Amino acid sequence: MSNKLVLVLNCGSSSLKFAVIDAQTGDDQISGLAECFGLEDSRIKWKINGEKHESSLGAFTAHREAVEFIVNKILAGQPELAAQIQAVGHRIVHGGEKFTRSVIIDEHVIKGIEECSSLAPLHNPAHLIGIRAAMASFPKLPQVAVFDTAFHQSMPERSFIYALPYKLYREHGIRRYGMHGTSHLFVSREAAKVLKKPLAETNVICAHLGNGASVTAVKGGKSVDTSMGLTPLEGLVMGTRCGDIDPSIIYHLVHQLGYTLEEVNNLMNKQSGLLGISELTNDCRGIEEGYADGHKGATLALEIFCYRLAKYIASYTVPLGRLDAVVFTGGIGENSDIIREKVLNMLQIFNFHVDSERNKAARFGKKGIITADNSTVAMVIPTNEEWVIAEDSIKLITK
C-alpha cells in the first residue's frame, strides 16, 4: 500500500463528499458521501474495496458529525489504511485573486477563504466548516486547500476584465474567475499524454459538462480563457443555470414583471437551463430520453445546449491560434455520445468527423479518441479532481 494517501474532502452546503486517494496512482481506497445535513434523515454512504456501506448520521447532523463518523467509524475500522494518511486535502470553490495555487491551510488562509465567501456564498462557508471540523478531528495532519479558481489565474486581462468601469475591478474585484479549474487542469494534462506531446506544446479546449458546465481554452498547459465568470452562472446552458443572457433581462423582470432580486437570482440559478427550457428535467439523461420520444421541450433544450457549447468551442480557437484537440469530461461529457456527436457535427468547419463506434465506446469511465483518423482530434477523458487534490497535498507537505 502507498504511504502517500490523502483524505480528500469536498464540502457542499448540505453534503460532504470524501475519499482516501493514493496520490501516486489516483486510486481511491475509500470513497463516500454524507448528505441531507440539517434534516431528520442525515445519512452517510461509503465504499471500501468495492463493498458498499450505509448508515444514519442521526437527525439534524452536519459537517462536524460527518467528519467525526469518518474518523471514528470508517477509518477506525481500517487502522492500517488510516495510518498511511499523510494529509487532508480540501476542494475550495473560490479563491479570488488571493490564491493562485494550492496552499497549506493556516489561520491566514482561512481568513482569505472567508474574504472570498461573497463570491461563492453557497460554497466557501461550507468549505470553512469542513476545514474546522477536519482540523479538530485530525489535529496532527496538515490541511491543504486546492482552489477551483487557481488554474484560471493565468488568464490575461483581456480574458478576465468585464467591459464595466475599471474601478469595479480595481476596488471590488469584479472580474471573470472561472470554475472547474482542477478538472480542466487534470484533463488537459491527460490529453497531452494521449496526443503524445509535451504539455507546454499542447493546445486544447476542455469541456467539463455536468449539472454545472464550463469550457476552458488551455494553451501550453495554462488557462487563457474560460466560460464561467465572477460566479458559476455565466457561460454555457447548464442543468438549472441559464448561462449567458442579456443583463437587461434582470431589470425587465424586476421592473416590468414584479420579481424581487432574490427571485431573479433563484430563477437564473435553479429554474433555468435544461430544466427551464424543457419544462421536464435538469437531468441530461431525462432530456435525451425526451428527445428520443419526440418531446418538444427536451428537443429544444438539447439543441440549445449543444449550439451554445459549439459556439464557445469555436470562439476559443481564437486565443489558442492552433487547436490540437477538444476534450470532453464531466458526467455529461464522459457519457453522452449523443451530445458529443451533435456538438462536433456543428464544428465540421474545423474538420471534426465523429467515428460513431469510437464515440459510443467512450462511456462509463472509458477514455479515448472519438473522431476519425483524418479528423481534428476530439477525445473523452474522465476527470479525477480528487487525484489532483491528493497530488498537490503531497507535493506541498514534502517540500
Curated annotation (Swiss-Prot):
Essential cofactor(s): Mg(2+); Mn(2+)
PROSITE patterns per the UniProt record, alphabetical: ACETATE_KINASE_1, ACETATE_KINASE_2
Subcellular location: Cytoplasm
EC code: 2.7.2.1
Domain of life: Bacteria
Residues the record lists as binding substrate: R91
Pfam families: Acetate_kinase
Binding residues for Mg(2+): N10, E385
InterPro entries for the chain: Ac/propionate_kinase (IPR004372), Aliphatic_acid_kin_short-chain (IPR000890), Aliphatic_acid_kinase_CS (IPR023865), ATPase_NBD (IPR043129)
Active site as annotated: D148
Biological processes annotated in GO: acetate metabolic process; acetyl-CoA biosynthetic process
Residues with site note (Transition state stabilizer): H180, R241
CC terms in the record's Gene Ontology section: cytosol
SUPFAM superfamilies: Actin-like ATPase domain (SSF53067)
The protein's role, per its UniProt record: Catalyzes the formation of acetyl phosphate from acetate and ATP. Can also catalyze the reverse reaction.
NCBIfam families reported for this sequence: ackA (TIGR00016)
The protein's name: Acetate kinase
Native organism: Shewanella oneidensis (strain ATCC 700550 / JCM 31522 / CIP 106686 / LMG 19005 / NCIMB 14063 / MR-1)
